[in-house]
């Protein structure tokens, strides 16, 4: 076998290759993190037997992602190593030097001593996409939530009576359409009744009729809100930002849905798990074989119980540790909530925890833990959901 070690950095990478006998086949060389650099790497590898090549690199941030995709697309065997493994090899090295060139040899030697290697597949690349999309989705939702809070505060100042008029709240299409065109009570009060009624009816799919439009105009005429032009500008701009984020979320979720449909994961057989929750779970877990037991997956998600013990005392009720992936933990709890609503066994388990005196969120945490164990088994053995 021929082992290729690549030390990853932001702008430039280093690579070298040695045979299974330890013979240096490619001396350490630098190549850029772009198409020219990737082609230089391939030109160095071309003289070697491709079927004998195993390429290894450390899992470090996102700087190596494009290179991994490039190599997998060209059908090279690529292994992403845990930095802990290369660190152990580095400590065992007689020379404690750490340079980019030395690190390429360390990666090669780490590949050589592994009992088994798992190579990156196209499915793994899809998981990388799901993880990136899922995290971007979470970040976008947080941004949108902050904007909605800001918008509520602006409307409270300029038209405080409005949020009580719309029973479903301010954050709906019909209210946004109204406020973009007439962000102040004065503007609403001066609108022609036919136009106001039409605007509300069209954007609420017929839920708001002419009578509601009349009531709204009377409310606007009597409003005690502040007449502030700066607030009206902030309202219209904030709504535009929210709508932009809404459109971005639609695109992200559509892409996640396409990836999930293509891969047809067994976790989609769980009642209550949709393409988005399922995609976020798969993306955050990655390779399920990284976790030798469901307990390790629980710990990775931070859903394992924290233990409090002092002398002969041990707490009977403990909280989840919350030390793992925050995104994965949130997704599991959210997914558990949906599964409880769609599966009798999970509903009974949830009810039992509530009967024991746990709060709603504590009970959901227990359900999430149960869901983790089931998903670990399903993904490990490729089994469809069946609690019967």
Predicted regions and their residues:
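A detector of single, family-specific signature residues
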Residues: 1-388
